[in-house]
């Protein structure tokens, strides 16, 4: 570890909507939604082909190499 970087969190890679994304190791689904500025939108989240209920977003931690798909509803006519 480089001097002065003691407070940097360890990171991991996940697949987010098909793209490799580097995130802190301790991130939850709720944290990710907030980071993506989607917290005010209606979203559906799937991790490794399993749908995650919105009620579990705050408790569901992501893990290295998870495959995450996030979709959000867009109104239209």
Model-flagged regions — what are they?
Residues 1-76:
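Ubiquitin-like/PB1-type beta-grasp interaction modules and other compact soluble beta-rich domains
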């Amino acid at each position: 570890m480089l001097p002065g970087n003691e407070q940097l969190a360890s990171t991991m890679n996940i697949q987010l909507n098909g793209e490799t994304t580097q995130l802190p190791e301790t991130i939850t689904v709720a944290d990710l939604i907030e980071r993506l500025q989607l917290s005010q939108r209606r979203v559906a989240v799937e991790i490794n082909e399993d749908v995650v209920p919105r009620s579990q977003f705050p408790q569901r931690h992501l893990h290295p190499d998870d495959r995450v798909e996030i979709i959000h509803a867009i109104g239209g006519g």
